[in-house]
Regions:
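Bacterial N-terminal signal peptides
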Residues: 1-9
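Catalytic-site microenvironment of enzymes
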Residues: 9-409
Length: 409
């Protein structure tokens, strides 16, 4: 049963043949104290990897349960002064600020990837990012992110930045389609939910098969949107561009949006990378990215940029952050500061170098909904008794100002 699905494409072509080869570049670049601090405080705060790490006097070996040989051995620097310089493809804000200034172009030379989250268009409903709000209208986040990215690209380029968008249309970047992923989805479902295949009271073999097939199709679509598409975007960037920063663009929403309900709340959210859940840290697909991100040391740059953007959003919108703090899924970067937190999501995991996830506004707040449905426009219009400009331009200008404050010269 369920055998014989032909896979016309898979994720294998998008994944590195040796996902651990990068470790060699970081030999002797980090002390044990720094490694442990970054691992336990930021990247593996829930302890998923602790039993798989074996320490010697000057090195650590990573060998998860069930593997015959270690996946890598990392030698530590004896002290900070003796640490080798870690290789990186991106420049820090300080390095960019030291470059010769260009009049009227404060971001000259800055290389930015813009990744408008989700897809939109005819894919919006399939990716479950299309919501009809009674009395308002339908909102598709993938389309909103595209509008924002186009405005942001124009503004950044006018200030001298080089900008590479991961997409400019409401079509998937990947050539993979759900039909190509049925075997993989079936295998993952068998591994994670073996009970799902058991006969339920009142079921026939035919109805059980139909239930399983529907679920496998759903899982294949999930793999496409949450994994294959993100891998394709990051591969596209690696093949054509070397960014100093990647900005991932989303709009947020409260849980009430699931069934099209509005909320009186309206807040902003900003993420940097980290905070792998225990089950995420145990997943072989994600482990190489965890250690790459830890060793690449992009967190200080991510936090500096995200904090600047968050500050501008707070100034211009007056909105408070979603106060995640040290939660079941997130970790603070700085004690007592909640505007920016670390979280492991595909969009900031798969891109190399510093990645900032910008996720402002609650789409299901009535005023935000009306502004979104009004589209982009010149000047101001009245919303909820207030004169306000285009929400897309407000979003773009907040990001631009945040980047100028960090990188500008």
């Amino acid at each position: 049963m369920f055998m014989g699905w032909v896979v016309a494409g898979s994720l294998a072509a998008q994944e590195a043949p040796d996902p651990w080869a990068f470790v060699e570049r970081y030999q002797g670049t980090i002390t044990r104290a720094e490694f442990d601090d970054r691992l336990h405080r930021l990247f593996d705060p829930f302890g998923g990897l602790r039993s798989s790490l074996q320490y010697s006097e000057n090195a650590v070996t990573f060998q998860p349960a069930g593997t015959e040989t270690p996946l890598f051995r990392l030698e530590f620097a004896p002290d900070v002064a003796s640490s080798k310089v870690a290789p990186r493809s991106w420049r820090t804000p300080e390095e960019i600020r030291r470059a010769e200034p260009v009049e009227g172009r404060p971001l000259a030379g800055l290389r930015v990837v813009l990744d408008p989250g989700h897809i939109g268009g005819e894919w919006g409903r399939i990716e479950q990012r299309s919501t009809l709000y009674p009395g308002f209208g339908r909102v598709q986040e993938g389309d909103l992110n595209l509008i924002t990215a186009a405005l942001l690209k124009t503004r950044l380029e006018a200030l001298g930045a080089e900008v590479f968008p991961t997409r400019t249309t409401a079509e998937p970047t990947t050539s993979v389609r759900p039909e190509d992923l049925l075997d993989e989805a079936l295998a993952e479902l068998r591994e994670k939910r073996p009970d799902f295949f058991r006969m339920r009271p009142g079921e026939t073999a035919e109805s059980r098969d139909r239930r399983v097939r529907n679920r496998v199709r759903y899982e294949a679509e999930f793999v496409l949107f949450r994994r294959a598409e993100i891998l394709a975007r990051s591969a596209k960037v690696r093949a054509a561009f070397q960014p100093d920063l990647t900005v991932v663009l989303f709009f947020n929403a409260s849980p009430r949006s699931i069934d099209g309900r509005t909320t009186p709340e309206n807040r902003n959210t900003f993420f940097v990378h980290g905070s792998y859940l225990r089950e995420e840290a145990l997943w072989p697909r994600q482990q190489p990215r965890l250690f790459y991100k830890l060793l690449d040391r992009a967190t200080p740059t991510e936090f500096e940029v995200a904090r600047s953007i968050a500050t501008v959003f707070r100034e211009k919108t007056g909105l408070e952050p979603v106060r995640y703090g040290d939660s079941a899924t997130t970790r603070r970067i700085e004690p007592g500061y909640d505007d920016v937190v670390a979280r492991n999501i595909a969009a900031n995991r798969e891109h190399d170098g510093p990645v900032v996830v910008v996720e402002p506004y609650f789409m299901n707040h009535p005023s935000v909904l009306r502004r979104l449905l009004a589209g982009d426009f010149d000047g101001e219009r009245e919303f909820e008794g207030r004169m306000m400009g285009s929400i897309f331009r407000e979003y773009a200008e907040c990001v631009v100002e945040g980047l100028v404050r960090v990188y500008g010269r």
